[in-house]
Amino acid sequence: MCIRDRTAEIAVKASITGHLVVSTLHTNSSANTITRLADMGVENYLIADSVVGVIAQRLVRRVCPACGIVREATAGEKKILGIKDPTRRINVRTPGHKECVRCGGTGYYGRIGIYEIMPVTADLRQAINRGENADVLEEIALTHGMKTLRMSAIDYALRGITLSLIHI
């Protein structure tokens, strides 16, 4: 089910009564999902009591494994990847040959999901009850080990799977 304003509170109340509710909500991050529910009129205490976790996801293009070219990252790519030392050697895989049979010459073969998984911990529940903004919620989640979408994309870039950081 995709949550809309008028059904958000019904979904939250159903989860409080023991029903497993799995839904979609279009936001830019896991933390923004919490604040979006509040913006829809769901009370903070209901959100804190009902949400056990949030997963944000994006699909990014996968560099073709058959023709992708491994090369050293440019200074700009290193900056995007968060590499502070510009002299550090970092390899990335970029789209390859136009004659590739596997990808039809596009340099990309399929898509792969990147994920941000935010379990709602006790600290996060308290922050939700206080009505904290998405930035504060994300900081709390990060202290409990959450990886952001950007961190996930960087991990895939360093492993040579994608270079689609611009979309994150």
Predicted regions and their residues:
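Short, flexible helix-loop junctions that flank or precede catalytic/ligand sites
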Residues: 4-165
